[in-house]
Design a protein with these regions (language model features):
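C-terminal substrate-recognition "lid" of short-chain dehydrogenase/reductases
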Residues: 235-262, 267
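Substrate-binding pocket helix/loop in short-chain dehydrogenase/reductase
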Residues: 105-106, 110-115, 213, 224
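Conserved glycine-rich cofactor-binding loop
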Residues: 14, 21-22
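Alpha-helical segment proximal to the catalytic Tyr-Lys
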Residues: 134, 191-192, 253
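Active-site helix of classical SDR
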Residues: 129, 178, 186
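The beta1-alpha1 cofactor-binding region of Rossmann-like NAD(H)/NADP(H)-dependent oxidoreductases
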Residues: 46-47, 68-80, 111, 238
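Residue(s) in the substrate-gating loop at a strand-loop-helix junction
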Residues: 162
Length: 269
């Protein structure tokens, strides 16, 4: 889908991407930048963020800024969004990719791990939804006399669920619960953010060739690929291209409150 985007589709816009140093997040950030977006990259590791920003700067005509932050920490997210706003003057969109797993079956699942996983996925998604709205879009709404923002400005959110939210996954009660909650939160945010004319959608990928999936090994990856209808696991770019389509109002300007199963047919909704 990235191929159908206009050149410079996101020029003059600032997008926030969490989980930006590897896998899906890095592919999303790179593809958005290639189509003109200024970026705030968010992840835990400042060194890897600097490397990622430099690499994106070499392949795109933008120089991303970044913020080392724990997405589950309120103050970190507040500072990250403020940094984007101070540096660029605008935030048009946020892509909530950041995620972790701590697999264990329910009898062995520690409460600390449960809270950690839910925190990164669900709390992180909520905090970026809240802060982008509070610091950026709600002020514009108030300045417009509390009237819908029919100003032609592109505003969007793309959240990340998972096929596991619908199908379950052994050892991942924390991950699957958080992803299911993100789907519900996406629908609520779509209703609330309609006043800002911001589109809020989510993607529910199947297996993707990322470091998070590497633990299954090559044979496990091939087996997952065989379980899909397209015969392979996704590459990060498959997901990034769909994100960019959701970010572009000329492609998805009439789409909000939806969860898209970008999963190769491994699960049919």
């Amino acid at each position: 889908m990235a191929r159908v985007l206009r050149d410079g589709a996101f020029s003059g816009e600032t997008h926030i991407v969490t989980g930006a140093v590897q896998g899906i997040g890095r592919a999303v950030a790179t593809t958005l930048a290639e189509h003109g977006a200024q970026l705030l990259l968010v992840d835990l590791d400042a060194g890897r963020l600097a490397e990622t920003a430099a690499e994106i700067g070499r392949v795109a005509q933008v120089k991303p800024i970044f913020a080392a932050a724990n997405v589950a920490e309120e103050a970190h997210v507040q500072r990250a969004v403020a940094h984007a706003l101070d540096a660029t003057g605008v935030v048009n969109g946020v892509v909530n990719v950041a995620g972790i797993t701590r697999d264990a079956r329910i009898p062995k699942k520690s409460f600390d791990d449960f809270k950690l996983v839910v925190g990164v996925h669900l709390y992180g998604t909520f905090l970026f939804l809240r802060e982008v709205a509070a610091q950026c879009w709600h002020a514009q709404f108030k300045n417009a006399g509390n009237q819908p923002l029919d100003d032609g400005v592109n505003r969007f959110v793309v959240n990340f669920s998972s096929v596991s939210a619908r199908n379950g996954n052994v050892g991942q009660i924390d991950y699957t619960a958080a992803k299911g909650a993100i789907e519900a939160a996406t629908r609520t945010a779509a209703r609330e953010f309609s006043a800002y004319r911001a589109r809020v959608n989510a993607i529910a990928p199947g297996p993707v060739n990322t470091p998070m999936l590497a633990a299954v090994g090559e044979e496990g990856m091939r087996a997952m690929g065989r379980a899909t209808l397209v015969g392979r696991v996704a590459e990060p770019q498959d997901i990034a291209s769909f994100v960019c389509a959701l970010a572009d109002p000329r492609i998805s300007g009439y789409v909000t409150g939806q969860v898209f199963p970008v999963n190769g047919g491994i699960y049919l909704a």
